[in-house]
């Protein structure tokens, strides 16, 4: 029987791979978790929350420089693949786990399927862009979420025969996991307690290009304060550890903490966060995944970046690129709050997981 290996290492990958894992329950497959960001114990709860099969292999790689982390992953993944001998390996996204998994499989002559293939920011300074491009070029099956992504791959000289436009599994995941969240009493109580059932904006900030540069981070802090004062709305800010560290280092944290409208909270679980997204009036972020989820949930999004690998969100007007200039950010917030919230979702109908599994086992286009 055809045997599949799934390789993942971060929570966004677990989320986006969850529909595929659910579709594989009647098939022969195993799950490798590199633990790129979190410990085995922390992610154990995450798998349980989403009612997913626990990983067969936890590699406990942890953090490190890009070369160190990718190299250790490559060695450990290779050991598992030699033992399991899968016919096919699936990876999702653009992390070091994805590149290491694809390289390990490629060196062993194992077929690779890249889910979310073809995304391009066209910014080679981003480590994720390198991972995306390299993984696409060594994969046999490229599961592109949209026609735009497929065209990016074609322009790089990859054969049309390898490309399958399947939609984005984030649609499946958001629909499936939102149902779990809405039935979870603990999650519902948390949302009510944090929001006090009032309207609010949701903020996330974690990208190195924003957090590691004092000038840019200072502008963003000014912008956040300006937004809260202009609209007199609570801004709920689940703060990323690296962002918290940098705000402290640069002496900027007090500028946020002294504003009673900015609610800085610890990072929250995925189901809780999904609830916060769904009920927000506006999402302000530098996250790629949140641009997609906001679009799916019909919540306007302001992206604190100069570029995006999700141009489809710009095309349907669910998202706008604001950069880091305070005046421009304020203008973008105003524009999105006035926008029509009923756009067409460009990422598919929520059946991407099923389509991908059918292609893997039938090796045919949908």
Curated annotation (Swiss-Prot):
Disulfide bonds: none annotated. CDD domains: GTB_UDP-GlcNAc_2-Epimerase. Active from pH 6 to 10. GO terms for cellular component: cytoplasm. Keywords: Cytoplasm, Isomerase. Its EC number is 5.1.3.14. Optimum temperature is 50 degrees Celsius. It is found in: Cytoplasm. The keyword Isomerase applies. It comes from the Archaea. Pfam families: Epimerase_2. It catalyses: UDP-N-acetyl-alpha-D-glucosamine = UDP-N-acetyl-alpha-D-mannosamine. InterPro entries: UDP_GlcNAc_Epimerase_2_dom (IPR003331), WecB-like (IPR029767). One of its GO terms (molecular function) is UDP-N-acetylglucosamine 2-epimerase activity. It is an enzyme of class 5 (isomerase). The active site is at 206. Belongs to the UDP-N-acetylglucosamine 2-epimerase family. Homodimer. This is UDP-N-acetylglucosamine 2-epimerase. It comes from Methanococcus maripaludis (strain DSM 14266 / JCM 13030 / NBRC 101832 / S2 / LL). The gene is wecB.
